[in-house]
From Swiss-Prot:
Taxonomic lineage from the root: Bacteria, Bacillati, Bacillota, Bacilli, Lactobacillales
Protein name: Arginine--tRNA ligase
Disulfide bridge map: none
Keyword Transferase carried by entry: no
Location in or out of the cell: Cytoplasm
GO cellular component, one term: cytoplasm
Length: 562
């Protein structure tokens, strides 16, 4: 049962001028439990009803059928609803226990496909902390949408094309070795590329050779294509090791190169629709009616640009997946690019352009400075994960040295801490990254939530395996009531996270639930043999289920022991 819907339905006859949706939007959580469980404010009705809000609240209470509630009372300008605690508890616990991890599932997406463009590192360059946000936000959104019956398609749009490959081929032929690349593809390919840029200062002829190699690559030369393909596959092997650590997989690795033969169609459509204009020798699409700068489609030398490739990709994805939404999890510095992309698609006559959504995000900083810049502040993601796991190991050794599967748990805690810290921050906010803070077991961290789950599992192990069922039994501790209400909010929280494309909604919910449960745990002797034992165990089991599922939606594991 959705209790917000129940309140809205009770209010509807008393508010004939408001739709059910409008009533739902106004319902809020009171500040304290003394003010009830849900409340309806009447301030906004004062103008239309020409009455004081307090009087409106009193009038509504008289018209409301309160039989589904313990009581409905007017408190100043609010109509306050108090739930029947025993029935509410039994209903919520029954929903969680009977559905397990599927609690909160909903058939909203009707199996519609949603491509998610995410992560997208450059071939022959390391995955840095700069890639973390796109990767974990995209993965979490895929999990959330999947829970609501969408079919996410995780696309890693690799940076696998461009003039840099001419330089890389030149550098490899001058100084490279197959054995070195196979042993450590990313670091050695990067080493060759960096050396190229150092040496071409005194040897400008190297630039000519690089241009020649890229031209060969564009023309399908056998050797150039073989080397490019090999650099790509070796890099991808290295990338997949990191994705494996994060427990993230992809449905497609089609990168920039895949669209090489698909861009001409874009140019043809733009020409057919007379959308291309000449500007200083280049070809552009005028977007002044959208209050945007012109979209540069072709440079004066005839070379196509990034947006042309993205237009080709958008058209390909619509044809391939017939998507209901198409998401691009890309930093907020690209906001203008995606506005242009949608505007050009609209001008081309594609009415599905509105289904494209840019999911921007802020930066990760260190000491207030951007992490990944040309000043050499690149922090490798692999190294951060190693350090996080090592820190988790230290904490586990201190807290629980006899834990049987320490390595596995340290992995889940350390890596989970990094992912959780990223996702608990609203995605548009930039945040400072401090590893010691991130891997703490106290405070608003991933390990804190994981520990609350492990603590619940520990209680259930100690209880043995009794038949846990939700019955209308009183849970007398006030902290139990706060925990129950939070459990009831999980389905709506998942929906909100999906509509706002905001995983932090789930992360913050998990923190609140863990705090409420820890308060309950501290104030209640759970394993006492009395009439409430079954109800208490049902609550503990439900908390364990929902915390585990909330963490799963974020892409974080929930160990049963810590």
């Amino acid at each position: 049962m959705d209790y917000k819907q129940l309140v809205a339905a009770a209010l509807a006859p008393a508010l004939p001028d408001l739709t059910q949706e409008a009533i739902l939007d106004k319902i809020e959580q009171p500040k304290t439990s003394k003010q009830g469980d849900l409340a309806f404010p009447t301030f906004t009705l004062a103008k239309t009803l020409h009455k004081a809000p307090q009087m409106i609240a009193s009038d509504i209470v008289e018209k409301v059928d309160s039989s589904d509630f313990e009581k409905v009372v007017a408190m100043g300008p609010y109509v306050n609803f108090f739930f029947k605690k025993d029935a509410f508890a039994a209903d919520i616990l029954n929903q969680v226990l009977s559905n397990g991890g599927h609690f909160g599932d909903a058939k909203l997406g009707e199996a519609g496909q949603v491509p998610i463009d995410m992560s997208s590192p450059n071939i022959a360059k390391p995955i840095s902390m700069g890639h973390l946000r796109s990767t974990v936000i995209g993965n979490s959104l895929a999990n959330i949408l999947s829970k609501l019956d969408y079919q996410p398609v995780k696309i890693n749009h690799l940076g696998d094309w461009g003039t840099q490959f001419g330089k890389l081929i030149t550098a490899y032929k001058m100084w490279g070795s197959e054995a070195e690349v196979k042993a450590d593809p990313i670091n050695n390919l990067l080493k060759y590329y960096v050396r190229f840029h150092k040496e071409d200062v005194d040897h400008p002829e190297m630039d000519d050779e690089a241009r020649e190699w890229f031209k060969k690559l564009e023309n399908g030369d056998e050797e150039a294509t073989h080397l490019w393909s090999w650099f790509r596959s070796e890099s991808l092997k290295a990338f997949k090791k990191i994705y494996q650590r994060l427990d993230i997989d992809f449905d497609s690795f089609k990168g920039e190169a895949f669209y090489n033969d698909k861009m001409q169609e874009v140019v043809d459509i733009l020409e057919d629709k007379h959308l291309l204009q000449e500007s200083q020798g280049a070809e552009v699409v005028d977007l002044s009616k959208y209050d945007l700068n012109p979209a540069l489609i072709k440079k004066s030398d005839g070379a196509t640009l990034y947006i042309t490739r993205d237009l080709a990709a958008a058209i390909y994805r619509k044809r391939t997946y017939d998507f209901v939404q198409s998401l691009y999890v890309v930093g907020n510095e690209q906001t203008n690019h995606f506005k242009q992309l949608k505007a050009v698609l609209t001008e081309m006559g594609f009415d599905w352009a509105d289904q494209i959504h840019h999911i921007p995000f802020g930066l990760i900083t260190s000491g207030g400075k951007k992490l990944s810049t040309r000043s050499g502040r690149v922090i490798l993601l692999d190294k951060v994960l190693d350090d996080a796991v090592a820190l988790a190991h230290e904490q586990i050794e201190a807290k629980n040295p006899d834990l049987p599967n320490k390595d596995e748990v340290a992995d889940a805690v350390g890596i989970g801490a990094v992912v959780f810290h990223d996702l608990k921050n609203e995605r548009m906010n930039s945040f400072d990254f401090n590893l010691e803070e991130v891997v703490r077991f106290e405070g608003e961290t991933g390990p804190y939530v994981q520990y609350a789950h492990a603590r619940a599992e520990s209680i259930l192990r100690k209880a043995g395996s009794p038949e846990i069922a939700a019955t209308e039994q009183t849970l007398s501790d006030p902290a139990a009531w706060d925990t129950l209400k939070l459990l009831s909010e999980f389905p709506a929280t998942v929906v909100r996270a999906s509509t706002e494309y905001e995983p932090s909604v789930i992360a913050k919910y998990a923190i609140h639930l863990a705090k409420a449960y820890n308060k309950y745990y501290a104030n209640t002797k759970i394993l006492v043999e009395d009439d409430e034992l079954n109800a208490r165990l049902a609550l503990v089991k439900s908390v364990s289920i929902v915390l585990k599922e909330a963490l799963r939606l974020l892409g974080v594991k929930a160990p049963d022991e810590m």
